């Protein structure tokens, strides 16, 4: 026996569907019902179907369910069943409206899935259709219509209905899937291995992946992919991955799905494994795709690519020389190019008004160099994905501290501002002890180059009691020029900046260096952008510059001592 569906298609009659509908009507009123009652009602509906061979439409069958419920006195259940049918009708209308307005019938399954997974009234497709209609314009392209539909779901997100963000993510994933299908057809790829071969030939994928794995291993790994895990994302997370981390063509079209990205990262990370390598690929893929762990930005962005710089955090010591300062800025540009964040210690750079080669008062101070760092962070933006990120550290006793503490504030001389970097201050214990004793005490600021020239040592190279002894020695040395401020005024500047900009960050150098297990081999001047790294630091130094003749051409060979250029990776797991 067959019945006619709403779309005119015929399908075999299934009495279990009728039973489920009746059970739901009782569940909606909180009333229990026996299997015998259910069977009686189902049999009555079935008898009608058998007797009326000319009208076996699904709507007519549902009418008979209503009649049967009311004949047996189940009026509340019949009422809820009628309401349920009306809501389903409204959802179908909304679904059809969205399909017609987007002009894409392939979105039907996605919309049905949303309706099934988010059945509550606040996530009704009717609301989505109404919001979408407010954005819809007839002249929109199909992709613009999808974007408007996604925007509609995003704008429906509220504190009372937060799951609209997950609905928006599903719609965004549908849009992404359509684009990926178009790109795959254009490239003529039918399998994951063919896609990797194509991307490698285009210079978008690291050749080392195909060199490390056989085609059979690649295809076996491809079977690990679980598209259902795309549903774990909310809109914000998926949108970020699509915009920043998926591989794109040179015309900026995505050519990699989120799950393919995770599998590519897993293939990269598992390359060194000698035993059961594909099992490790699967473990890494599962951890990533289930959102149980996330990698640092450079790993997400660069693993599997030709330039596979995976580290996230770097620290450089900026030396007090023109060559050294520009070398540090160049290093930051290269780190930023491949997704790393940077911490830069400027405590060795001479203060404004300092001497240069004996010429008095000509030094411009650290602010002008920090402005260059700021502009580098903005300019080197990882192919437009995001601008660079850098924290600049200065000692609380540095002469340029007051100007430094106003780098990001909105008042004052705009030529002394750098709004796109993150200032941080290095404090000794002495500063906090004096602040606790009496905020009105004087604190003295010095030029590090002047201390080195007159005293013969670098004050920033010490910590703890030795630093305090040398600091007081500098305070009492009349040959050194000093800038005096009350501790209260310094704290006021710090708090004003913190309230207005969220900076400066704090680095308590004495505490860190006392805990440093390698303090016999160097000193930790500062931390990185995230302020979680503490490793010995030293500046890169030029050893020699030599002019040679090679193959008849003059070449300049520069030898440098690398110093301690700090690097660290960061991964975050979910408890």
Region locations from a protein language model:
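Extended catalytic cores of very large enzyme megasubunits
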Residues: 1-574
């Amino acid at each position: 026996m067959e019945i006619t569906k709403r779309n005119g298609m015929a399908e075999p009659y299934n009495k279990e569907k009728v039973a489920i509908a009746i059970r739901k009507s009782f569940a909606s009123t909180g009333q229990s019902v026996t299997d015998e009652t259910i069977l009686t009602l189902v049999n009555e509906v079935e008898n009608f179907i058998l007797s009326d061979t000319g009208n076996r439409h699904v709507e007519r069958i549902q009418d008979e369910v209503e009649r049967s419920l009311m004949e047996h006195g189940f009026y509340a259940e019949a009422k809820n069943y009628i309401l349920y049918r009306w809501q389903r009708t409204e959802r179908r209308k909304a679904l059809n409206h969205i399909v017609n307005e987007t002009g894409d019938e392939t979105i039907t399954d996605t919309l049905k899935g949303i309706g099934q997974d988010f059945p509550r009234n606040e996530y009704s497709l009717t609301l989505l259709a109404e919001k979408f209609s407010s954005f819809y314009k007839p002249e929109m392209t199909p992709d613009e219509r999808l974007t408007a539909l996604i925007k509609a779901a995003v704008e429906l997100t509220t504190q009372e209905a937060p799951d609209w963000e997950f609905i928006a993510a599903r719609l965004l994933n549908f849009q992404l899937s359509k684009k990926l299908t178009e790109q795959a057809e254009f490239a003529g790829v039918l399998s994951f291995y063919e896609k990797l071969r194509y991307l490698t030939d285009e210079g978008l994928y690291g050749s080392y992946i195909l060199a490390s794995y056989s085609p059979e291993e690649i295809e076996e790994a491809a079977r690990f992919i679980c598209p259902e895990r795309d549903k774990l994302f909310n809109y914000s997370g998926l949108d970020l991955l699509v915009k920043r981390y998926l591989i794109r063509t040179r015309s900026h079209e995505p050519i990699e799905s989120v799950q393919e990205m995770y599998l590519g990262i897993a293939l990269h990370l598992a390359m060194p494994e000698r035993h059961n390598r594909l099992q490790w690929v699967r473990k890494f893929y599962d951890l990533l795709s289930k959102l149980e762990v996330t990698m640092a930005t450079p790993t997400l962005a660069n693993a599997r690519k030709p330039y596979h710089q995976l580290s996230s955090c770097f620290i450089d010591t900026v030396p007090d020389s023109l060559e050294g300062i520009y070398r540090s800025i160049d290093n930051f540009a290269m780190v930023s190019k491949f997704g790393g964040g940077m911490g830069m210690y400027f405590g060795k750079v001479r203060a404004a008004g300092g001497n240069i080669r004996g010429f008095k008062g000509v030094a411009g101070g650290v602010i002008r160099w920090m402005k260059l760092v700021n502009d580098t962070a903005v300019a080197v933006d990882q192919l437009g994905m995001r601008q660079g990120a850098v924290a600049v550290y200065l000692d609380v006793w540095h002469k340029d501290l007051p100007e430094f503490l106003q780098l990001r504030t909105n008042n004052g001389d705009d030529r002394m501002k750098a709004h796109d970097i993150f200032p941080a201050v290095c404090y000794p214990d002495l500063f906090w002890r004096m602040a606790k004793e009496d905020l009105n005490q004087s604190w003295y600021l010095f030029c590090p180059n002047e201390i080195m020239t007159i005293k013969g040592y670098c004050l920033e190279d010490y910590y703890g009691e030795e630093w305090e002894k040398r600091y007081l020695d500098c305070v009492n040395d009349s040959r050194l020029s000093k800038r005096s401020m009350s501790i209260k005024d310094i704290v006021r500047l710090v708090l004003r900046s913190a309230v207005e900009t969220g900076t400066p960050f704090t680095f308590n150098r004495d505490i860190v260096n006392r805990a440093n297990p390698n303090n016999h081999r160097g000193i930790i001047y500062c931390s990185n952008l995230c302020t979680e790294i503490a490793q010995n630091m030293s500046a890169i130094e030029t050893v020699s510059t030599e002019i040679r003749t090679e193959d008849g051409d003059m070449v300049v060979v520069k030898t440098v001592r690398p110093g301690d250029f700090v690097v660290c990776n960061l991964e975050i797991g979910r408890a």
